[in-house]
Amino acid sequence: MKRTFIMVLDSFGIGASKDAEKFGDQGSNTLGHIAEACARGDADIGRKGPLYLPNLSRLGLGKATEESCGTFPAGLDKDADIIGAYAYASELSSGKDTPSGHWEIAGVPVLFDWGYFKDEENSFPQALLDKLVERANLPGYLGNCHSSGTVILDKLGEEHMKTGKPIFYTSADSVFQIACHEETFGLDRLYELCEIAREELTDGGYNIGRVIARPFVGDKAGNFQRTGNRHDLAVEPPAPTILKKLVDEKNGEVVSIGKIADIYANVGITQKVKATGIDALFDATLVEMEKAGDNTIVFTNFVDFDSSYGHRRDVPGYAAALELFDRRLPEMLKRVKNDDILILTADHGCDPTWSGTDHTREHIPVLIYGPKVQPGSLGHRETFADIGQTVAKYFELSPMEYGKSML
């Protein structure tokens, strides 16, 4: 029975890639800088001491990081008994965004340039805004700028509730984000507005990767909170991914947990499981691992590393989340049977010690575990698509155009 479990620790980079300078990210290192802060005692809020990741260390995380950047992460166990294969991978795609990273993991790098809204203020074309107001029958709009999602809620959330005007904002990523209150504006209405925005952006040739619904609750600045009802409307990958090939060629199953289905625009997904928060995502993953039959991929995105800690530049929070994931990892490892393979990886970096609030261009870890996987280094992988090619070979699918199998 062949089953693959792919876990994306969203934003968990392990050192700047060779081309990081082009992105202003030379010297970034998500894991390395978190580990250094913990070792210095600068991350003792809600946790304490050096970063403690014994289970990820046994899978080769520390060694992969050392190969990536030349420095072993502070506090991690250098003498851990390695039980998995490990590597670090560079991104071939032109961007450092979520769809690019995930599509490349699934064998389809993004070699074109996304469109971006580069102006910090008045970010969106007036013609686009006018169409959204007209088609969605809006009283107007707020924002129209670059912003962190939590900052803009404190700034404009109360006005949004009073006026019914949605909050439009963007970032350095190829995104059009819409924040609306779940109760005063309505969740279904927000989703409808996002569908309209997706249509207008596509028909208008803007080439924007994602429209993101950002629902929130609360009654005043300071207590607004984004909910788990986020929804991403992505464009479809430009070529068949390993997910689509498994379904088409083997009549296989692909179980999306978290935001995976959104990222691939539902293409190649046979089942969707929603969960919010690391524990809930982990619980859902364990359930689906138990249920998985032959020719199945269970694919989970642990978004909180990125959304709650990376973008918010919260070092103690990121460290505590990693330690939580590591504590629970044995539950996952014991569900890996016989011919199964488990792959732990990331889609980009988001160094919480870095300036700004955006992603960082970094190598990602590739940690592979299974009873038949030979432990040891798999070296430097020139593209995330090596993961996709490895999975394609494992399931005996037609080869992907990009990537080399690691097993």
Swiss-Prot record:
UniProt keyword list: Cytoplasm, Isomerase, Manganese, Metal-binding
Main location class: cytoplasm
Positions that bind Mn(2+) 1: 10, 347-348
Cofactor: record remark: Binds 2 manganese ions.
InterPro entries: Alkaline_phosphatase_core_sf (IPR017850), DeoB (IPR010045), Metalloenzyme (IPR006124), Phosphopentomutase_DeoB_cap_sf (IPR024052)
Record function comment: Isomerase that catalyzes the conversion of deoxy-ribose 1-phosphate (dRib-1-P) and ribose 1-phosphate (Rib-1-P) to deoxy-ribose 5-phosphate (dRib-5-P) and ribose 5-phosphate (Rib-5-P), respectively.
Family membership: Belongs to the phosphopentomutase family.
Protein name in UniProt: Phosphopentomutase
Gene name of the encoded protein: deoB
